[in-house]
Amino acid sequence: MREGDSNSKKSADVAVLSITLTGSTLTLIYTYKRYLTQFKRTNDIPRRIFRKHWLYGKVTSVGDGDNFHFFHMPGGIRGGWGWLRPVPQMIKNDSTAEKLVGDSRNMRFFNFNWITHGRSTKSKIQKAKSQFLKLNVPYKNRKNLPTIPIRLCGIDAPERAHFGNPAQPFGNEALIWLQNRILGKKVWVKPLSIDQYNRCVARVSYWDWFGGWKDLSLEMLKDGLAVVYEGKVNTEFDDREDKYRYYEFLARSRKKGLWIQNKFETPGEYKKRI
């Protein structure tokens, strides 16, 4: 082979190798940006994600009965989480659920009330509350992390005490239930919209070893710890409103959770009143 032909072949090989490396690099960059970039706040989530895609991550804090903080872990283990990229470790909780909401104990009633008709209703309410207060809250909330605030779609949980206003009945119990169910665990989040508090309104799904995949909003409705969302702004159901209303009806007819009360003020009514 002549020297000129040899040089031409080498140049062609170098060009092919260069194009291949450039293409591979661009593909890796594209893949990382599209599938492995961590979203650290609500505004990081691209519009293309909303209503179409699910995000995987860990619940690091639960501050209320219908919202929590979500640490995004794109790609899971295959995305390097736990071996290349650090995952926040939870701190074990040494307090019981009742201590976490200490004022709930003060809502107990005097023993001599059994002679009154009201005692029966109060006993039923207290019994309903106690089953939630006994739930295990395994971890403490982790704060000051790059997390996305998540608001559960389609439901409203009873309000807890805020800004000097008293808590609604079952507000603390809803918080404990949610902490027991998801705090420190991995969940899937489907972003739907952003509310006025810059929270990501989302449908949330988690795995239960005894029941498979669970819709978190639906499970709260089933246990009578939330009502179907009544507001006209940021109303999101992800095409599950009829199902949510059906299970709310079942919980109400069976007097589960907050529905055991004879007189009940919805979270929406409570917020309007105060």
From Swiss-Prot:
It is an enzyme of class 3 (hydrolase). Belongs to the LCL3 family. This is Probable endonuclease LCL3. It is found in: Mitochondrion; Membrane. Its EC number is 3.1.-.-. SMART domains: SNc. It comes from Saccharomyces cerevisiae (strain AWRI1631) (Baker's yeast). Keywords: Calcium, Endonuclease, Hydrolase, Membrane, Metal-binding, Mitochondrion, Nuclease, Transmembrane, Transmembrane helix. The gene is LCL3. GO terms for molecular function: endonuclease activity; metal ion binding. It is a single-pass membrane protein. Gene3D superfamilies: 2.40.50.90. The chain crosses the membrane at residues 15-32. Residues 53-261 form the TNase-like domain.
